[in-house]
Regions:
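Conserved P-loop
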Residues: 4-65
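Conserved RecA-like ASCE ATPase "motif II neighborhood" in helicase/translocase motors
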Residues: 50-94
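Ser/Thr/Gly-rich flexible loops in soluble cytosolic domains mediating phosphotransfer, phosphorylation
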Residues: 94-102
């Protein structure tokens, strides 16, 4: 059975989480889902990182086809993305659980 690797970058504000995500995305060639792709692209450029694809929240939930192979992605701010998806369906996120396993 193949082990599924999921990166979780958990740290305080202003600690470099997003820059670490940029480096992972660049190295792996995996796009990043984010609220504002243009702002994120400019932020990556300011760190000297280019060649990353960014996908908006809206594009992430509407693009693709169920028959397509699942595409690997990173998500910047998973809480915000979850909130966005739930709000689209008239739900309001009030809490969640997360495992601290590697």
């Amino acid at each position: 059975k193949e082990k599924i690797v999921m990166y979780r970058i958990i740290d305080g504000r202003g600690t470099g989480k997003t820059s670490r995500l940029f480096l992972l995305a660049k190295e792996a060639g995996i796009p990043i889902i984010c609220q504002c792709p243009q702002d994120m692209r400019e932020r990556a450029y300011s760190y000297g990182i280019t060649g990353i694809d960014f996908i908006s929240y809206q594009e992430a939930i509407t693009a693709g086809d169920k028959s397509d192979t699942a595409k690997e992605v990173f998500v910047d701010n998973i809480e915000q993305f979850s909130y966005y998806i739930l709000m689209k369906n008239h739900f309001k996120l009030k809490g969640f659980t997360v495992s601290n396993e590697d």
